[in-house]
Design a protein with these regions (language model features):
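Residues at secondary-structure transition points
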Residues: 31-42, 70-74, 78, 176-180, ...
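N-terminal beta-alpha supersecondary unit
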Residues: 1-65
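Short beta-strand scaffold segments in enzyme catalytic cores
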Residues: 14-19, 120-124, 203
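Acyltransferase
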Residues: 174-229
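Surface "functional belts" at beta-alpha junctions
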Residues: 23, 35, 90-180, 209, ...
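DPxDG-like acidic metal-binding loop motif
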Residues: 60-91
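A glycine- and small-aliphatic-rich helix-loop capping segment at beta-alpha/alpha-beta transitions
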Residues: 20-24, 78-85, 127
Length: 229
């Protein structure tokens, strides 16, 4: 039996879960505007203590690897890597978008996260399988893709800010807001192969703003940017 600590801080909500294989033992989710760096470790301690568990009881850590908030992803990934290294246990990363997809929703399911300026991080799933690559896209492009689908379409995830635009473009589309769910991260991460702790990095899908601004003012390649840093 594998005990998994799963975490998702890719968005405004912070979600933690502990599972034994796919059975949920306990979960906490905080949907408050608070820096995840302040709340993550105390929340892990609270959950572990509530289940009378010790860190050494864990076999694997599953973390929402991205996309999402740059700061949130860095906090979760750094914490997951530190715990996995210290405890000498396995580490796996799970798509933050896939973890937003509810079970048993028919047709094309499109999880979205607000990426600002009317852009979104979007995935395209059918029966839990990706039918297009996850990407950072203008909402208009996502709506164009969804509008061309010959099957029911459901938008999930961070939908509130975009509900009016979705309904205007695709009146028949279903909209189902979903919060980050660490239990889903844990279940998705159960069967994945363990990843290298040293090489594990967030999946941003988009350059950070500082890098984009630098590249606008320089003709060199993105490799040059990294070298200069």
């Amino acid at each position: 039996m594998m005990k998994i600590l799963a975490m998702d801080t890719s968005n405004k909500a912070l979600s933690l879960a502990i599972l034994e294989n796919k059975e949920l033992l306990g979960q906490v989710t905080f949907n408050i505007k608070k820096n995840h760096s302040i709340t993550l470790m105390p929340a892990i301690d609270f959950l572990m203590n509530s289940l009378d568990m010790k860190p050494t009881d864990l076999d694997r850590i599953a973390v929402a690897q991205g996309p999402g908030s740059y700061t949130g992803l860095r906090i979760a990934v750094a914490t997951a890597k530190t715990l996995a290294h210290t405890l000498k246990i396995e580490l796996v990363g799970v798509s933050s978008l896939l973890a937003l997809v509810p079970e048993q929703v028919e047709g094309l399911v499109i999880p979205i996260m607000d990426a600002r300026r009317n852009n979104v991080y979007a995935g395209f799933y059918q029966s839990g399988q990706a039918v297009r690559s996850e990407a950072h896209l203008p909402l208009a492009e996502v709506l164009e893709i969804a509008g061309a689908a010959d099957q029911p379409v459901t938008f999930v995830g961070e939908t509130a800010a975009f509900a009016e635009q979705i309904k205007a473009a695709i009146p028949q589309a279903a909209i189902q807001p979903t919060l980050p769910d660490a239990a889903a991260v844990g279940r998705l991460g159960l069967d994945l192969p363990a990843q290298s702790i040293h090489d594990f990095v967030p999946s941003y899908l988009k350059r950070v703003e500082a890098e984009e601004n630098w590249l606008k003012n320089h003709k060199e390649s993105s490799d040059s940017y990294i070298q200069r840093l």
